Each structure stands twice: as C-alpha cells, then as structure tokens.
Regions:
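Conserved phosphate/anionic-ligand binding catalytic regions in large, soluble enzymes, centered on
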Residues: 38-58, 144-147, 233, 237-249, ...
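Short Gly/Thr/Asp-enriched flexible loops that form oxyanion-binding sites at enzyme active sites
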Residues: 100-108, 151-158, 246, 308-327, ...
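Glycine-rich phosphate-binding loop plus the immediately following alpha-helix
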Residues: 157-187, 327-350, 355-364
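N-terminal small/polar loop signature for handling phosphorylated ligands or for N-terminal nucleophile
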Residues: 88-151, 254-312
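Gly/Ser/Thr-enriched, mixed-charge loops and adjacent short helices
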Residues: 33-42, 152-286, 291-292
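Phosphate-binding and adjacent anionic-ligand microenvironments
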Residues: 293, 297-299, 320-322, 340-534, ...
Length: 572
C-alpha cells in the first residue's frame, strides 16, 4: 500500500475521533510529513513500541496501541488457560498515557483476557513486581521513559517480570501485523468490571508489598537507622512516577531529611521545567542544584518519568557539583555491595554480577577483585533479567547486582527490570556509609579510581531521522562490518566482535560470542580500551561507545577524546 492510500484510508475509513481527523487534515498539503507518518508501521520489538505522538501508522496513537494490544491478546490466547492469569497495566505521566492504558485494558477485556489496571501512574519496577506478585501472564507499561515530551511508548513484560525477549517479540509482531486496524474493539468499562475482566489495583494489592521487599535490600539497616536522619538529600522525580515510591522508601528506612524540587514534584506531561526528562542530562539537575545549595545538601537524586533510571549529583571537594555517570553509579553500587558483604562474611562463593557489553570494564575489575564472576549481556535490561532467571533455574550462581551504563541498576530478584527505587535506597545507604567514615560520595568514587585505575566512558550519538536516516544507518553498519578498522588512534584493533554474526575474530581465529544475534560491532583495542557501534533500538540514532583507561585521570580523558575523534570518522 502506498503512503497516499494509507493516509486516505486512515482519514476516511476508521479514524473515529475528532483529534485524529483534525491532525490528518492538517498535513493534507505536506507530502513529506505524510510520507514520514505512513511509509512504514511503527515497529514492535523487545522494547515494545516507541514513537512520536500523532496520527499515522508510524506514530504513537490509540489506534496503534489498540492494534498492538489485540495482537498481544491473540499471542497470549494461544494458551487460553494461561491467558486467564491476566495482564497488569501501568502508565507514567506522559500525554495520553492514562488514555492508552485504559484502551489497552478494554481491548484485552473484549478478547476475554483479564486486565489489572493501576489506579494512578506507577513506575516500571512496580509493574515488574506486580506481574510476578499477581502471577499474571504479562504486563504492559505505557511510557517513553526519558524521551522528549512528544514521545510515548508501549512496553510489554513477560510472566517473569522482564521485558519480552526476541522470540516472544517476533511472535507478538506477527499477530499485530495480521490484525486490521478496524478489528480492535473495546469492551464497555462497566461491563468489563462486572464480568471480572477489569480490576483496578492500588497500594493494598501491590505497592505495600513491593516497598516491604525493597526494604530487605538494605545491607546495613542499622547504619541507616543511625545516620539516615543526618543525611540531607535533594530529590527530583522530574514530573514522573517516582515521587511517591522513592520518598516512601527513603522515609521508611530512616532517611527523613529529603527536600523535593517543588517545581518538578507533580506530574506534568510537557515536562515544562526541562528540555528532556533525562537524569543523565545536566539540564535536569538545574533546579535541584539550586535547592541543594539552599538547604546544604551534598547529594542529589533524579529519576526519569517511569522511575526505572537514577541519576546522581555529588558535591566535590572544591564545592562544585558533579554528575556521576551511569557507569560510575554502577561501579559505586557494585563495590559497596561486594565490599560490605565481604566484611559481613555474607558474600556467596558463587556470587555473580551482570552488565551490558557497552558498560564500563571497570566493573569487571571490581568484581574480579572480590572473586565475583561478571557476566555480560547485550544492551537491554531484559537480558539481565534472563540471566537472573538462568541463575535461579540452574542454581549455578547467586545474583548480586546488575547494571547498564544508561543509568539502570538492580540488586533484587523480585523485580526483573531496572529499578530507580531500589537504586535510590542503595545510593542513600552508600552516602550514609561515607558520612560515617567522614568522607563524601565524591571521595568514594575517587577511591575506586585510585584502586583500580581511571576509566573514562563517553557515548556519541548521530541522529539520522526518517526513511533516509534508516537507510543510512544500515549502510554505516554494513560498511563497518565488511571493512572493520585495523587501528584506531594509533592503537591496534586486537579483536572484532560482530554480534549480528555471533562471532569474535582475533588473530585470524573465530569463536562464538555466546550471545543472541544483534546489529552491534565491538572493536577491542590494546590495553583494554574499546569502541562499540550500534543503532539505537528506541530512537533514530546510531550510537558510538568509547571506553578508555589509564593510571592517570588526565591521560585517560585525553585518550578518550582522541579516540572519539578517530571513531566518529567511522560514522561519516
């Protein structure tokens, strides 16, 4: 079907609401916009769907949400008895999130699949926990995480509480594609409730149990009881779903001196105080830093709209504020967990940590120093969730901690996605431990570098929007795959990992990577440095990860800057 036909079909055949019709009519004389909205369908993958809000096949809207839900229902109904376990639905503070969540519940009800719909916005980790706690067959979160406000998304979770894997995503996609837009009916809400196909859930059903479980993750609860009231923290939920659970967990473990950025406390679908609601963006911390200076806090927490990611800012020795990178936060938490458990005599002999392949190699050194095995996965926290399940199924290892450089952290097994509530609790505990020793979180980070070496990690993104951008990304990856660099910045490429082929090639020898296939290229360099290239799974970007290390901070930073310049040329 050509784009013009698809546009006309949407406009005249099934777009039933006035807003969608008005949106379509507004682009009637804009062929480029029509092309972008209708040249392809919004893709569904392991990260679900994510896109710009608006009318069209390639946009996030209630018609794509309903169609995706009908496809998911068909997929689940391949086993009708299991489908009766139901699907849990959560949503964040974005535009249309509540409406999309309601539509999702009522499409499921129409198909005979029970829906558990939260009574208000909830973070990703509570959804993940709820799927497991309620023994549901699946879960859905309406969110676009940290994307700009014009985006929304639809993430699907399997019965273990982790995002669906590639095989399930492919199966769901096949059912979605075979579903006409006109074949996505909604059951009346009152009828769905009367038939037991729609249940509204809240604190009593899920949240209270989740918070109780998170409290068990404290490694030194007595330390929190002694030092918690002395610690001054500034927290911003950046207008998202973390406001209630993060403040609650901190309060219940004894951290009472938490100042919340009032301008960012309440839900705001436009995220009007920031350019992007992203806790790795310095702009998200401007108001928090102002408040921290006013109240004398030395630590700032920020969670993104769906509260699966945590950003941290710390006061340095000279009084400046420094934002910790996701890699630094991950290494602080890993080192604290392992060192504290070692001192307590509770570090298991079969302990394991897990990180993504694009996360810092510093974590490998830390884990090795405590005799803990580090496992690596592809990007996407679902793969960390898979490893947790493997450990439990086989009894081979005890999971201790998992993280991604993109500010996602987890130390529990009762949640299977990154957890900003869990991470907030642990960083607060580390801050208390530091205070008890007369040092700061910043000092703790520097002590890790002094012990293991200085590691610098940078991510460079090249945005390539639209149909042409997608083609260009494929060309770049094809060229690099066929003609990999032999050296970068004067350093020899010692090995090439091609995750699409599933191979690692070094000195003419080829061995399997042991990971699922994915369009990722990883160039190992001398002295433990490396560069990784991959297309983003959620945005029209190609990402370049540059990791360097040296015994001296300045040397590590200069090497990283030089290597970035050399590596960026690969994307031209």
């Amino acid at each position: 079907m050509d784009v013009k036909t698809a546009y006309e079909q949407w406009l005249h055949d099934f777009a039933a609401d006035a807003d969608t019709i008005a949106d379509l009519k507004a682009i009637a004389n804009d062929p480029a916009e029509i092309e972008d909205r209708f040249y392809t369908e919004l893709s569904f993958g392991t990260a679900g769907m994510r896109g710009v809000l608006g009318a069209g096949m390639n946009r996030m809207n209630r018609y794509n949400v309903r169609r995706a839900t009908k496809g998911l229902a068909k997929y689940l109904l391949q086993n009708p008895q299991e489908a009766q376990r139901g699907v849990v639905i959560a949503y964040d503070s974005r535009r249309f999130s509540a409406e999309f969540a309601r539509d999702t519940a009522l499409v499921l009800a129409q198909e005979g699949v029970p829906a558990y719909l939260f009574d208000a916005l909830r973070p990703v980790p509570i959804l993940s926990y709820a799927v497991r706690h309620l023994h549901a067959i699946a879960g859905i979160v309406i969110t676009a995480s940290h994307n700009p406000p014009q985006y929304n998304g639809y993430k699907v979770y399997a019965e273990d509480g982790a995002q669906v894997g590639p095989e399930a995503a492919d199966g769901i996609t096949a059912f979605i594609r075979s579903t006409p837009y006109t074949d996505c009916k909604l059951m009346d809400e009152e009828e769905a409730k009367a038939k037991g196909l729609l249940k509204i859930i809240g604190n009593k059903e899920v949240d209270d149990d989740y918070i109780a479980q998170v409290k068990t993750l404290c490694i030194q609860p007595e330390l929190l009881a002694e030092e918690g009231s002395k610690l001054s923290i500034v927290y911003t939920p950046i207008h998202g779903s973390g406001n209630v659970p993060v403040r609650r967990i901190l309060r219940e473990v004894g951290i009472s001196n938490v100042s919340v950025v009032k301008e960012q406390e309440l839900p705001d679908p436009n995220f009007s105080t920031v350019k992007v609601p992203n806790p790795e963006d310095p702009g998200a911390f401007v108001l928090a830093i102002k408040l921290a200076d006013e109240v004398g806090a030395k630590v700032i927490f920020a969670t993104d709209p769906d509260c699966d990611r945590l950003g941290v800012a710390v006061k340095t020795g000279n009084g400046d504020w420094q934002l910790l990178t996701g890699n630094q936060i991950g290494c602080v938490l890993l080192h604290y967990i392992l060192s504290t458990k070692q001192k307590q005599g509770t570090l298991p002999k079969n302990g394991a940590a897990v990180k993504s392949i694009v996360s810092t190699s510093l974590a490998n050194k830390i884990a090795a120093s405590f005799g803990v095995e580090m496992f690596e996965t592809l990007t996407g926290f679902k793969f960390i969730g898979e490893k947790i399940q493997q450990f439990q199924d086989t009894g081979s290892h005890t999971f201790l901690f998992g993280f991604e450089e993109s500010y996602g952290f987890l130390s529990s097994t009762f949640v299977r996605d990154k957890d900003g509530v869990n991470a907030s609790l642990l960083i607060a505990e580390v801050a208390c431990a530091c205070a008890a020793q007369g040092i700061t979180l910043y000092d703790y980070v520097q002590s890790i570098f002094r012990e293991y070496g200085y590691f610098v990690e940078k991510v460079v993104s090249k945005t390539l929007p639209g149909k042409d951008g997608l083609s260009r990304m494929k060309e770049i990856m094809k060229d690099l795959r066929e003609n990999p660099p032999k050296e970068l910045c004067g350093m020899k490429v010692t090995a090439v990992r091609d995750y699409l082929k599933g191979t690692r090639t070094a000195d003419g020898k080829v061995e399997p990577t042991g990971l699922p296939k994915s369009d990722v290229l990883y160039f190992e360099l001398e002295k433990g440095n490396w560069v990784c290239v991959r297309p983003s799974g959620t945005e029209p970007k190609i990402k370049l990860y540059v990791n360097t290390n040296a015994s001296d901070k300045a040397d590590a930073e200069k090497l990283n800057a030089d290597l970035r310049v050399a590596s960026e040329a690969l994307l031209d």
